[in-house]
A protein has these predicted regions:
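Bacterial Sec-dependent N-terminal signal peptides
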Residues: 1-9
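Aromatic- and acidic-residue-enriched segments that line the glycan-binding/catalytic groove
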Residues: 139-172, 205-209, 213-251, 405-421
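Aromatic-rich peripheral "rim/lid" segments of glycoside hydrolase catalytic domains that contact
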Residues: 228-239, 398-453
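Polysaccharide-binding and catalytic clefts of secreted carbohydrate-active enzymes
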Residues: 77, 174-186, 194, 204-307
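Glycoside hydrolase catalytic-domain groove-lining segments
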Residues: 256, 265-280, 284-364, 384
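Structural preference for beta-strand elements that scaffold enzyme active sites
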Residues: 127, 143-147, 207-212, 288-292, ...
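Active-site-adjacent substrate/metal-binding segments within catalytic domains
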Residues: 13-149, 155-210, 256-270, 276-277, ...
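Substrate-binding cleft of secreted/luminal carbohydrate-active enzymes
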Residues: 208-210, 214-215, 350, 364-419
C-alpha cells in the first residue's frame, strides 16, 4: 500500500457529473484533522466477524443491536460491538471481458470471493452490502458478514407494468405508475409471500447480518392526493385509500380538502401497510436476523418525514439510507433519523467518481471529483461525520466494481461511471483504497476519541 501523507482539513472540488461545467469547493475533514488523535496507532484486535474484541456484551449467536450509553452499536454473534464497514454489490460483472478477466485472475467465482474478501479485510472492511455474491461468499472457508436483499415490490412492479401495458403514461424516475408504491394491491401480498419466504434459507447462518426489502421505493409527499385523483375508482388501491380518507375526514370530504396534516398521517399509514406485510412474512421465516429496512433515499420526501420514521422505528431494527446530495452528512438531519425512529441507521449507498478513471462519469447520483485521492478524502470526511453522530452503526460504499463500459446490458446509471473500488478488470484504485484503509483500521479508536474516552 502507498504511504498516506499527513494532512489536516482540506478543500476538495466536486461537481454532480461531467455535464456540469462548474466546480464547487467543499470543506473536507480527514483523519489527520482530528486534534490530538494518534493516527499512527490502529485498532486493537478484532474477532472473526470484525467486532471490537476488547469489549463484550451478551452473545446471542446472531447479529443484534444495542444502545450503550448514548451510542448505538451492532453487536456481533460473539457479543462484541461492531461497526458495519461494508461494500455494496460485492459481485462480478457479466460481460464477456469481465468473465474472461475473472477466469484469468481467479479461475472461479469461489477463488475470486476468497481472494477479494481477504483483500477487503486487509483494507479494514468487515461486511458486504446488498446485491453481493452471497452463494460464493457462503461457500468460502472464511466468509465475511453479509446481507441479503429480497424485492417483493420490485418483483410485483414487473407484473404491474405488464398489467398496464408495459409503459406508464405518468411515472417517476423509478418507473412506478403515478410514482406510487402498490402496497394496497391484493396481488402484491402474493409477491410478499413468494419473495420474502426465501429468507428461510439463511435463518440459521451467524454470518448473515440481516435483510433489506426492496430499494428506493417512491414515497412521494402527495401520495394521498395521487391515489384519490389519478387512480380509477374501482382499483383496490383507490378503494383502500378512499376508505382511510372517509374515516379520517368524513364521506363528503373531497381531494381539495386534503391538508398537510392529512398527507403526513397518510404517509405513515402508507408505509405501515408495506412494512407490516413484509415484516410479518420475514419474522415468520426468520426470527433470528435483523431487518434493515427498504433503503430510504429522497431528502425532499421520506428522509425529512418524521411520521414515516416513527413508523419505520416500529418495524426496522436499523434504518437504511442511501445518502446522496450531501458532501458531508448534516448532523441535525442524520440525528433526526434516530430521534424520530428510536433506532440507529446505516448508510447503504454513498460514493464519488474520479475523473482520472478514463470513464465518462455522466451518470449516477454521487459526486464527481478530480482524482482517486480525492475520492479517498471524501470517504474519510463522510465516515468521520457518521461516527461522530453516535447513531450510525455502519456504511456500505457503492460499490465494489466499476461496470464494463462496453457492456450495454448494465443499468444506465452505473454504466459509464467510476463508482467502484476496482476497475471492471479487477485492477484496484490504490489511492482511494489507501485512504479507506487509514480510516477503517482506526474506527474503534475514532469512536473512543469522539466519545471522550
Amino acid at each position: 500500500m502507498l504511504a498516506v501523507p499527513v494532512r489536516a482539513q482540506i478543500k476538495v472540488e466536486a461537481r454532480k457529473n461531467t455535464t456540469v461545467p462548474s466546480w464547487t469547493s467543499y470543506d473536507t475533514r480527514t483523519l489527520d484533522a482530528l486534534k490530538g488523535f494518534k493516527v499512527k496507532k490502529t485498532d486493537p484486535a478484532a474477532d472473526q466477524y470484525g467486532g471490537w474484541k476488547a469489549v463484550s456484551y451478551e452473545a446471542t449467536g446472531f447479529f443484534r443491536i444495542q444502545k450503550v450509553g448514548d451510542r448505538w452499536w451492532i453487536i456481533d454473534p460473539e457479543g462484541h460491538p461492531y461497526i458495519f464497514k461494508g461494500v455494496t454489490a460485492f459481485s462480478v460483472g457479466h460481460s464477456e471481458r469481465q468473465q474472461n478477466a475473472l477466469k484469468e485472475k481467479y479461475s472461479t467465482m469461489e477463488g475470486w470471493a476468497d481472494a477479494e474478501m481477504e483483500h477487503l479485510r486487509q483494507l479494514g472492511f468487515n461486511g458486504l452490502g446488498a446485491w453481493s455474491a452471497v452463494a460464493a461468499v457462503r461457500k468460502s472457508p472464511r466468509p465475511m458478514p453479509y446481507t441479503v436483499i429480497v424485492s417483493p415490490m420490485g418483483r410485483y412492479h414487473g407484473q404491474h407494468l405488464r398489467k398496464y401495458g408495459g409503459k406508464y403514461l405518468q411515472h417517476g424516475w423509478q418507473n412506478y405508475r403515478f410514482d406510487l408504491a402498490m402496497v394496497f394491491d391484493p396481488e402484491f401480498d402474493k409477491y410478499v409471500e413468494q419473495e420474502v419466504a426465501k429468507v428461510a434459507a439463511y435463518k440459521d447462518d451467524p454470518w448473515l447480518i440481516g435483510y433489506f426489502t426492496d430499494n428506493e421505493i417512491p414515497w412521494v409527499n402527495d401520495a394521498l392526493d395521487r391515489h384519490l385523483t389519478l387512480l380509477a375508482h374501482d382499483e383496490p388501491a383507490y378503494l383502500a385509500v378512499r376508505k382511510w380518507f372517509d374515516e379520517r375526514k368524513g364521506k363528503d370530504a373531497r381531494p381539495e380538502d386534503i391538508t398537510q396534516e392529512d398527507r403526513d398521517a397518510f404517509s405513515a399509514f402508507y408505509l405501515d401497510t408495506y412494512l407490516s406485510k413484509v415484516t410479518a412474512v420475514l419474522r415468520k421465516h426468520d426470527p433470528n436476523h435483523l431487518y434493515l429496512g427498504c433503503r430510504f433515499n429522497q431528502w425532499k420526501e421520506e428522509l425529512h418525514n418524521k411520521a414515516m420514521f416513527e413508523v419505520a422505528g416500529r418495524y426496522m431494527d436499523i434504518i437504511s439510507v442511501n445518502h446522496y446530495q450531501r458532501w458531508t452528512p448534516d448532523m441535525e438531519e442524520i440525528t433526526n433519523f434516530e430521534k424520530w425512529s428510536g433506532k440507529p441507521f446505516i448508510v447503504t449507498e454513498f460514493y464519488t467518481k474520479g475523473e482520472d478513471s478514463d470513464l465518462p462519469n455522466t451518470t449516477g447520483a454521487g459526486w464527481n471529483v478530480h482524482t482517486q485521492t480525492e475520492r479517498g478524502w471524501f470517504y474519510q470526511n463522510f465516515c468521520l461525520q457518521l461516527l461522530e453522530s453516535k447513531c450510525c452503526v455502519g456504511w456500505n460504499w457503492f460499490k465494489y466494481m466499476d461496470n464494463d463500459p462496453e457492456d450495454q446490458t448494465t443499468d444506465y446509471s452505473n454504466r459509464d461511471s467510476n463508482k467502484g473500488m476496482v476497475k471492471w478488470n479487477f485492477e484496484p484504485y490504490p489511492e482511494l483504497l489507501d485512504r479507506m484503509k487509514q480510516l477503517n483500521d482506526r474506527t474503534y479508536r475514532i469512536i473512543k476519541y469522539f466519545d471522550g474516552k
